[in-house]
């Protein structure tokens, strides 16, 4: 008898995922490193993130259906994403995970996937880094 693989989206559930994202963006809105690259009204950003994370975690392809292929790197190129900002983004997410009670192996694996994604989005050095030419 084979066991059905666990789908991360089913493990976290829509309600908890959406709560995570709402808490996350409440933190982003107050973060001095992140605030400059986000709009003042984060409702549309949060809506798209909910769609993306649903799909990212193996749920329905609701992001792609509305917006096409995620093309994360290309969609983030207009914004100056530094290592410092990537870390601030991850800290906001970690704090949001704490607040919704996300823990254990699921949290560890999910967070590590987000670390890889956040680092992939970096497109500029920190302001205090020397740029070699």
Over which residues does each language-model region extend?
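Core of compact, soluble alpha-helical bundle domains
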Residues: 1-133
């Amino acid at each position: 008898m084979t066991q059905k693989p666990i789908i991360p989206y089913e493990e976290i559930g829509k309600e908890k995922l959406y709560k995570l994202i709402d808490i996350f963006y409440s933190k982003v809105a107050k973060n001095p490193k992140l605030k400059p690259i986000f709009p003042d009204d984060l409702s549309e950003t949060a809506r798209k993130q909910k769609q993306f994370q649903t799909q990212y975690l193996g749920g329905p392809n609701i992001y792609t259906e509305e917006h096409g292929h995620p093309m994360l790197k290309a969609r983030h190129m207009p914004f100056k994403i530094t290592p410092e900002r990537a870390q601030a983004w991850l800290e906001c997410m970690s704090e949001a995970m704490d607040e919704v009670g996300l823990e254990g192996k699921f949290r560890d694996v999910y967070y590590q996937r987000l670390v890889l994604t956040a680092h992939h989005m970096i497109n500029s050095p920190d302001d205090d880094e020397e740029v070699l030419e």
